Swiss-Prot record:
Region (Disordered): 1-35, 79-248
Gene3D superfamilies in the record: P-loop containing nucleotide triphosphate hydrolases, Translation factors, Translation initiation factor IF- 2, domain 3
One Pfam family this sequence matches: GTP_EFTU
The protein's role, per its UniProt record: One of the essential components for the initiation of protein synthesis. Protects formylmethionyl-tRNA from spontaneous hydrolysis and promotes its binding to the 30S ribosomal subunits. Also involved in the hydrolysis of GTP during the formation of the 70S ribosomal complex.
Subcellular location per the Swiss-Prot or TrEMBL entry: Cytoplasm
Organism listed in the record: Haemophilus influenzae (strain PittGG)
Region (G2): 377-381
G4: annotated segments: 453-456
Main subcellular localisation: cytoplasm
Region annotated G5, chain positions: 489-491
Protein name: Translation initiation factor IF-2
Amino acids binding GTP: 352-359, 399-403, 453-456
Recorded superkingdom: Bacteria
Length: 844
């Protein structure tokens, strides 16, 4: 239908709508002036044809609707007439039957006249009932027909209105000034505006030269005409303030009746700004809410999970709490650890004071001479070994250093152990590290077995050891306690078998079990960086079986187990519970004490390791920032403090930790040791460059510098020192710190002179005639004047003469004349004390 209308629309006829003429005139001042006048012809639209077509279309639709309604009404009428005819036929049949019955009873009419008269009212009643039924049926049929006709008319009317609206919307685009499309009209108006602007641009210079009020009036009138024309057009198309938008131009979006409350995911910590962004509210709303709760916060302040949850729920949001460690928990939770537990070997840590025989005892047990390689009798790093007994039972030993600097290493060994063997020398008794080992064992909850060593010496006294240990709550079985005391001699092997039996007996009491066939987990005993093999970690397997090729997550590091070696350097393919192995293949050197866990997915293990590194970095930065803020004012008040910068490189991680901790403890209020760098492995060129930049000394503990590092060290004249015993390292660092201390100055009396007489001199004033009673009186040294042993003046000598000669010094027992500078109140009996200032070196 719409296509027909478009076809009937006459084609656009282009006419010249604008004509320009020039009007000449004179101004008020008498000057001639030419004004261009533009005459625009109004657009005419012939709408008769379109209106006729619309009226014709509407009439056709109404006629069709009327025809449909009439057809439906006729059908309903025919149906009603058929029902009426059927009812009438039934009534006629009944009346015929009655009539036939009456004919048969006619011969006896005379006899039954009275009876016939009695039956007539009954017939009349039936007829009346039949008539009433017919009337009701006709009424119902008529109402039904009227209802259907009304519905048909409404349906037809609705169809007609829908067609009208479609025609109006379709014809709207084609009903314009000249029956062209609306889009063509807009394009034409745009072209007109461009032409006008182009004309104005050409005449801009001329207009600027002419100026005057008439030009402004002309421009204003033109702007007004343009504005009026635009307003009329906008009003027609529903644009602008006065325009009414048609149904086709109105937006169908309806504003929601209430604010949508979305779910808010909250991590362990969140800032106020992030919380506001997630809840789609202003941050000021959250700040107001928290002020009502009694908390003063800023927009960038970090709030905890519970507070954020409370605020979000107060504002009507549903909160989803997210655990930031969920990836780590998921990775560590996806492990096969449900296998049956079996009995495992005990892990025994040997502790004790320096040189009490720990390594020698372990050496005898292992039947290997490793103690000869230990420098200075100190175990340099934790060693882990397992030995098999004659009856097939196995014991794993951890050997810890005895020096005071290795406190953290002993603490780690105690945590990973089941039984602590405390080695005490029978001739030396309880020492400081012995007490510390007892404390570590108690903190770890590990039972003690005391090995009283060196009983073969003549001065050995095991009973004294038991008495001394009683003071530290280590009660032997002899005194009613539960601690086994075993006298041994590591040198001769006496009592070693008894010690092993005591260890196995203690392990049976503990009932040690572990999963053997599941995925392995353990603890890092030691770690270091090997130049050829890369990062190496000594891992004590605590449960499960560690196999070659397993993916291991170890603290901040991860990797696949490329190779495993036992304590003898032999390659092994797997290691069960309580077995220590050296593991190769990690991404870096893990920290000693980190948990080592076998996981399924290497990619997820990498993600967990990176997450741990990031979290540790954040905590470290926060701690540093806090320390800076706390120490800012104290550092300002202290002034300059001498600093000794040190770079520490060692063979294993435990030694690095111990040395750094010991160096930090050496710091005093005047000299501080600052460890600018530390690490595991040899000394590299990077370390030398760092030492140059920070003016530090390099300390190598059981490591050496490579060739490139040595060249840089020699060129920059860096102080490089190698050590293999921690005593020497700490003593030399102390000496270096002592050299940085401010020296102390001490006054020493070198001579004493007694005033015997006083002379007056026109040049020097009062001259004291003195006798040197002690030491030497020197001309250039400072002096004090004492009267009745009280200092009344301190200064220097102006002259020192013996007879008439100036001398530099006068010795004991000689007379001299002394002139005191700027002091003339010298009296007989005074004492002149001569002293010198001596620099005294300090040490830490």
């Amino acid at each position: 239908m719409t296509e027909d209308v478009k076809a009937d629309v006459p084609k656009k006829l282009s006419i010249q709508r604008r004509t320009k003429t020039t009007v000449s005139g004179t101004t008020t001042s008498g000057k001639s002036k030419a004004v261009q006048v533009e005459v625009r012809k109004k657009r005419t639209v012939k709408t008769d044809i379109a209106q006729q077509e619309e009226a014709k279309l509407k009439a056709q639709q109404e006629a069709e609707a009327k025809k449909i309604a009439e057809q439906k009404a006729a059908e309903e009428k025919a149906r009603l007439e058929a029902e009426k005819a059927a009812t009438k036929k039934e009534a006629d049949e009944k009346s015929k039957a009655e009539k036939a019955k009456a004919e048969t009873a006619k011969p006896a009419k005379s006899a039954v006249d009275s009876k016939a008269k009695f039956v007539d009212p009954e017939k009349e009643k039936r007829k009346a009932e039949e008539a009433e039924l017919r009337r009701k049926a006709e009424e119902v049929a008529r109402q039904k027909a009227e209802e259907q006709a009304r519905r048909a008319a409404e349906e037809a009317k609705r169809y007609a209105e829908a067609d009208d609206s479609d025609n109006e919307s379709s014809s709207e685009d084609y009903s314009d000034y000249n029956l062209s499309s609306r889009y063509a009209l807009e394009a034409e108006d745009e072209e007109d505006r461009r032409n006008e602007n182009r004309g104005r641009g050409k005449n801009k210079v001329a207009k600027a030269k002419k100026g005057g009020r008439d030009d402004e009036n002309s421009k204003n009138s033109k702007n007004e005409r343009e504005s009026n024309r635009k307003n009329q057009k906008d009003a027609k198309f529903g644009k602008g303030k006065n325009g009414k938008k048609g149904a086709a131009l109105q937006q169908a979006f309806t504003k929601p009746a209430q604010v949508v409350k979305s779910d808010v995911v909250i991590g362990e910590t969140i800032t106020v700004a992030e919380l506001a962004n997630k809840m789609a509210v202003k941050a000021t709303e959250i700040i107001k809410m928290m002020m009502k709760m009694g908390e003063m916060v800023t927009i960038n302040q970090v709030i905890d999970q519970e507070t954020a949850q409370l605020v979000a729920e107060e504002l009507g949001h549903k909160v989803i709490l997210r655990n930031e460690n969920e990836l780590e928990e998921a990775v560590l939770g996806d492990r096969d650890v449900n296998a049956e537990k079996v009995t495992r070997a005990p892990v025994v840590t040997i502790m004790g004071h320096v040189d009490h025989g720990k390594t020698s005892l372990l050496d005898y047990i292992r039947k290997a001479k490793v103690a000869a390689g230990e420098a200075g009798g100190i175990t340099q790093h934790i060693g882990a070994y397992h030995v098999e007994m004659d009856d097939g039972k196995m014991i794993t030993f951890l050997d810890t250093p005895g020096h005071a600097a290795f406190t953290s290493m002993r603490a780690r060994g105690a945590k990973a152990t089941d039984i602590v063997v405390l080695v005490v020398a029978a001739d030396d008794g309880v020492m400081p590290q012995t007490i510390e080992a007892i404390q570590h064992a108690k903190a770890a909850g590990a039972p003690l077995v005391v090995a009283v060593n060196k009983i073969d010496k003549p001065e050995a006294n095991p009973d004294r050891v038991e008495q001394e240990l009683l003071q530290h709550d280590v009660i032997s079985e002899k005194f009613g306690g539960d601690v086994q005391f075993v006298p041994v001699s590591a040198k001769k092997g006496t009592g070693v078998d008894d010690l092993l039996d005591a260890i196995l007996l203690q392990s049976e009491v503990l009932e040690l079990t572990a999963v053997k066939d599941g995925m392995a987990s353990g603890v890092v005993i030691e770690s270091y960086l090997d130049k050829g093999r890369g990062p190496v970690a000594t891992i004590l397997v605590q449960s499960g079986t560690l196999r070659k090729g397993d993916i291991v997550l170890c603290g901040f590091e991860y990797g696949r187990a490329r190779a495993m070696r036992d304590e003898n350097g032999k390659e092994v393919d797997e290691a069960g519970p309580s077995i220590p192995v050296e593991l190769l293949g990690l991404s870096g050197v893990p920290a000693a004490g980190d948990e080592a866990t076998v996981v399924r997915d290497e990619k997820k293990a990498r993600e967990v390791a990176l997450y741990r590194q990031g979290k540790f970095r954040e905590v470290k930065l926060a701690r540093q920032q806090k320390a800076k803020l706390e120490n800012m004012f104290s550092n300002m008040s202290e002034g300059d403090v001498a600093e000794l910068n040190v770079i520490v490189k060692a063979d294993v991680q435990g030694s690095v930790e111990a040395i750094v901790q010991a160096l930090n403890e050496l710091s005093t209020n005047e000299v501080k040791v600052k460890v600018v760098g530390s690490g595991v492995g040899g000394i590299t060129e990077t370390d030398a460059t760092l030492a140059t930049a920070s003016n530090a000394i390099i300390v190598g503990f059981n490591v050496r510098a490579d060739a490139t590092a040595r060249r840089v060290i020699e060129a920059e004249n860096i102080d490089l020192r190698y050590y293999s015993i921690i005593y020497e390292l700490l003593n030399e660092i102390k000496a270096a710190m002592s050299g940085m201390l401010e020296p102390e100055f001490k006054q020493e009396i070198i001579g004493l002179a007694e005033v015997r007489d006083v002379f007056r001199h026109p040049k020097f004033g009062a001259i004291a005639g003195c006798m040197v009673t002690e030491g030497v009186v020197k001309r250039n040294n400072p002096i004090r004047v004492l009267r009745d042993n009280v200092v009344i003046f301190e200064g220097e000598l102006e002259s020192l003469r013996r007879f008439k000669d100036d001398v530099s010094e006068v010795r004991n027992g000689m007379e001299c004349g002394i002139g005191v500078k700027n002091y003339n109140d010298v009296k007989v009996g005074d004492q002149i004390e001569v002293f010198e200032v001596v620099e005294v070196k300090r040490s830490i």
